[in-house]
């Protein structure tokens, strides 16, 4: 890790409701192997030697988080999440900016990506240490891509050669990301991930190829796939 990265903190926006899962609770609180997805995700981040702290943004009326064992961990800090992802990330960044120890870089990671590999985090840190903007984990698009018309029929085939699936973590300098998110929200810009805020300001974040196993649990069938990946890792240990 480059010397300029004196402090690396992970930010986990976890205030979403995950309605597409059609479950009785937000998807981050569904269980795999006796632990919630959120616990798997945060423990994966905090076990990386470069990450000193995790700040998790949770809804103020969340009834689940306080019952988790990680809620009492000294290196896991809860802050109030917002209505949108960008609001939650900005809340965590504002908290960090008020601390006596400066946070140079942040890794923003989806609460529902419990399978991120340490080797991918290593690659992201290595690439961003020499990049002026920062970057994201991503995977190249492999399927043939079609653009639909208003009637949900194929309009044309899209060239996939320059297309990537954006993953997380996404890693940026804390001050730069704070300014970008604040400005974008003030202007009413739709922010779907942290990189899009930097793109809006004209920056060019790096793409760092990651593992396809770094899935986001969004649909019911994703839960079984995440369980498979985590079981495979457990068997290898």
From Swiss-Prot:
Pathway: Isoprenoid biosynthesis; isopentenyl diphosphate biosynthesis via DXP pathway; isopentenyl diphosphate from 1-deoxy-D-xylulose 5-phosphate: step 2/6. The record marks 20, 27 as: Transition state stabilizer. It catalyses: 2-C-methyl-D-erythritol 4-phosphate + CTP + H(+) = 4-CDP-2-C-methyl-D-erythritol + diphosphate. It comes from the Bacteria. Disulfide bonds: none annotated. The record marks 160, 216 as: Positions MEP for the nucleophilic attack. Its EC number is 2.7.7.60. It holds the Pfam family IspD. Keywords: Isoprene biosynthesis, Nucleotidyltransferase, Transferase. GO terms for biological process: isopentenyl diphosphate biosynthetic process, methylerythritol 4-phosphate pathway. GO terms for molecular function: 2-C-methyl-D-erythritol 4-phosphate cytidylyltransferase activity. Catalyzes the formation of 4-diphosphocytidyl-2-C-methyl-D-erythritol from CTP and 2-C-methyl-D-erythritol 4-phosphate (MEP). Belongs to the IspD/TarI cytidylyltransferase family. IspD subfamily. This is 2-C-methyl-D-erythritol 4-phosphate cytidylyltransferase.
